UniProtKB/Swiss-Prot annotation:
Signal peptide: 1-15
Source organism per UniProt: Rattus norvegicus
GO cellular component, as recorded: extracellular space
InterPro entries with a match to the protein in the record: Alpha-s2_casein (IPR011175), Casein_CS (IPR031305)
Keywords on record: Milk protein, Phosphoprotein, Secreted, Signal
Intracellular or extracellular location(s): Secreted
Residues found modified as Phosphoserine: S24, S25
Tissue specificity annotation: Mammary gland specific. Secreted in milk.
Keyword Nucleus: no
Annotated segments matching region Disordered: 44-121
Name recorded for this polypeptide: Alpha-S2-casein-like A
GO molecular function, one term: zymogen binding
Family as reported in the entry's similarity comment: Belongs to the alpha-casein family.
Length: 179
C-alpha cells in the first residue's frame, strides 16, 4: 500500500513538473491547428495553412480538444513509463499473499500439491526473534558507550597564570629534595 501511495505521489510530482515545462494551451493549439503537408516523408506546417484551417470539416475547437487529449495521453504514458522504470530500479519489497508467492514459483498447477503457507504463529515467532535481536544490539551499543567513552569524563579547571606576578610556590619538577 505504501508503494502504491509513493508511486502516486511521484506521478503527481512529475505531472506538475511537466505542466510547468509545457507551453500554454492556446500556443499549443495554434501550433497544431494547421493542415500538415507531406513532402519527401517529412511533415511540416506553414503559417498560410494554419490561416486556411477554418475551411476544414472540423472546427478548431474540436481539433484543439483532440490535440489536448492526445497530449494528455502522451504525458500519461510518459509518467507510467517513468514510474515503471523507477519501480524496477528501486528495490522495494514486493507485497504478495502466500498463494501468489507459491504460484509464481510453481508455474504448472499441481492438484495434489500442498503449499507451504506460513501460519500466524510462525510469523509471530519471527517477529519475537527480530525484537530480541534488536534489544541485544541496543544493549551491546550501550555497553560499548559505557566502556569506551568518546568524551572525557572529568574536566579539570585550569589555573590562570599571570606573568606579572610570579607564583610563590613555584618548584622545579626535576629538582630533588634534600633531606
Amino acid at each position: 500500500m505504501k508503494f502504491f501511495i509513493f508511486t502516486c505521489l511521484v506521478a503527481a510530482a512529475l505531472a506538475k513538473h511537466a505542466v510547468k515545462d509545457k507551453p500554454s494551451s492556446e500556443e499549443s493549439a495554434s501550433v497544431y491547428l494547421g493542415k500538415y503537408k507531406q513532402g519527401n516523408s517529412v511533415f511540416f506546417q506553414t503559417p498560410q495553412d494554419s490561416a486556411s484551417s477554418s475551411s476544414s470539416e472540423e472546427s478548431s475547437e474540436e481539433i484543439s480538444e483532440k490535440i489536448e487529449q492526445s497530449e494528455e495521453q502522451k504525458v500519461n504514458l510518459n509518467q507510467q513509463k517513468k514510474s515503471k522504470q523507477f519501480s524496477q530500479d528501486s528495490s522495494f519489497p514486493q507485497i504478495c499473499t502466500p498463494y501468489q508467492q507459491q504460484s509464481s514459483v510453481n508455474q504448472r498447477p499441481q492438484p495434489n500439491a500442498i503449499y507451504d503457507v506460513p501460519s500466524q504463529e510462525s510469523t509471530s515467532t519471527s517477529v519475537e526473534e527480530i525484537l530480541k535481536k534488536i534489544i541485544d544490539i541496543v544493549k551491546y551499543f550501550q555497553y560499548q558507550q559505557l566502556t569506551n567513552p568518546h568524551f572525557p569524563q572529568a574536566v579539570h579547571p585550569q589555573i590562570r597564570v599571570s606573568s606579572w606576578a610570579p607564583s610563590k610556590d613555584y618548584t622545579f619538577p626535576t629538582a630533588r629534595y634534600m633531606a
